Amino acid sequence: MNNNIILQCINLTKSFYRKKEEIRTLNKISLKIRKGDITFITGKSGSGKSTLLHLLGGLDKPTSGSILFDGVSLHSMSSNEIAKLRNLKLGFIFQFHHLLLDFNVLENIAIPSLISKKSIQESKEKSYEILKKVHLEKKINKYPSELSGGERQRVAIARALVNQPSLVIADEPTSHLDKNNAKIIFDLIFELNSNLNTSFLIVSHDLRFIKKAPILLEMKNGQLFNNKN
């Protein structure tokens, strides 16, 4: 396997049955994510995008096909190994920030680091460094309720990056933001990709920004198509 390939899925299929009829939500998907890639996936609701992200994040199992992370099959990993992979090698950004309201900015960012058994001091130091990269170091002691929607999503991005993952998976990260904050988030993602060489896999419907995508795929009826001219 090419050492630059972080994640690869081969002939990935996910099916369910309705009255003995097989319904395929994903149909023989093959995909490669390389180090430093920014890959966008677009497509209509119900086309299979969320199902694909769940499989790639180890949150569900395919009906057939394989998923390799750094050359190792997720199928061969135990549930504990997959959980460790999700915490250390993968970062996740969702439509809603999912910040803990009783934790301040620094404490929210530090959570994945603490889960990975880092000390409180090391976790705080790592969190502050990534906080500077999302340009929110002046908000270090603020609580989510004291932040704007765009700032809360930037904290969520910092939390996804605190363990220096190889790949960040983002599901509609700007869907709840206005145009200006959405632009800030996408500009930040491209900046972080350039500075950290972190790969991003982003599901988005925001046509204003996916036009900038170096790799653009479209999901149609459970299949992926290259949509970049």
UniProtKB/Swiss-Prot annotation:
Q: Which domain of life is it from?
A: Bacteria
Topological type in the membrane: Peripheral membrane protein
- Family annotation (InterPro entries): AAA+_ATPase (IPR003593), ABC_transporter-like_ATP-bd (IPR003439), ABC_transporter-like_CS (IPR017871), ABC_transpr_LolD-like (IPR015854), LolD_lipo_ATP-bd (IPR011924), MacB-like_ATP-bd (IPR017911), P-loop_NTPase (IPR027417)
Q: Does the keyword Disulfide bond apply?
A: no
- Drop me one GO molecular function for this one: ATP binding
Q: What is its EC number?
A: 7.6.2.-
Which Cys residues form disulphide pairs? none
Q: Which SUPFAM superfamilies match?
A: P-loop containing nucleoside triphosphate hydrolases (SSF52540)
Look up keyword Magnesium and say if it applies.
Answer: no
Q: Name one GO biological process term.
A: lipoprotein localization to outer membrane
Q: Which family does it belong to?
A: Belongs to the ABC transporter superfamily. Lipoprotein translocase (TC 3.A.1.125) family.
What function does this protein fulfil? Part of the ABC transporter complex LolCDE involved in the translocation of mature outer membrane-directed lipoproteins, from the inner membrane to the periplasmic chaperone, LolA. Responsible for the formation of the LolA-lipoprotein complex in an ATP-dependent manner.
Q: What name goes with this protein?
A: Lipoprotein-releasing system ATP-binding protein LolD
The organism is Buchnera aphidicola subsp. Schizaphis graminum (strain Sg)
* Underlying gene: lolD
